[in-house]
Amino acid sequence: MKIIAIADTHIKSGSIIEHLPAELITLLKEADLVIHAGDFVTRAAFDELSGICRLEAVHGNMDDAALKESLPEQKVIEVEGTRIGIIHEAALSIQDTTGAWYMAKEMNVDILIFGHTHRPVIEKSDVLLACPGSPTSPRLSEPGAIVLDIDRGKISGKVVTFEGPVCSIIESAVSYHMQNGR
């Protein structure tokens, strides 16, 4: 089974198709399952994505009230005998994924997909920790997603990257300072 994991799309207005990289849209449509680890921002973005792929999702800290009411904070799904946990905030940073590892243990999962950091990471120990980064607003990384393949209990995963801005946090800071006359 081919799974695409994304997070932190932060689509505030307009079509999700307009904001996501074209290569990612193709991957989403071809996937058996898409997992979104929160921060769609609007219900419209969630609804549109649900219309183009089979979607499992949780809400993130920036999602609107409608999404927070309809999507759980965390969930566990099972795919071909593999338990996958989905949560938005699991690690304080990509440099230290200890919190994510403990969350995976607490959720009793084989794979933990999480977001919030806007930077991709795949880390394998006794569980697979997978943060897809952000395809639209990465932080000091390239726009990204994760491709997972699960076949008869064997799991493989990789980060895929797309063309686009790589330093949105810096762009935001510059924009803030320009708006405030600094």
Report residues per predicted region.
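Pre-active-site segment of Zn-dependent metallo-hydrolases
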Residues: 13-26, 86-87, 91-105
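N-terminal active-site segment of His-dependent metallophosphoesterases
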Residues: 1-52, 63-72, 142-144, 177-182
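Conserved beta-sheet core of the metallophosphoesterase superfamily
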Residues: 56, 92-158
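Helix-adjacent hinge/juxtasegments
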Residues: 56-98
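Short beta-strand micro-motifs in enzyme catalytic cores
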Residues: 2, 73-75, 83-85, 128, ...
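Short, conserved loop/helix-junction motifs that constitute active-site signature segments
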Residues: 49-52, 79, 105-107
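Active-site neighborhood of phospho(di)ester-bond hydrolases with catalytic His/Asp-centered motifs
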Residues: 5-7, 33-39, 55-61, 86-88, ...
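Short, solvent-exposed aromatic-acidic interface loops
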Residues: 158-169
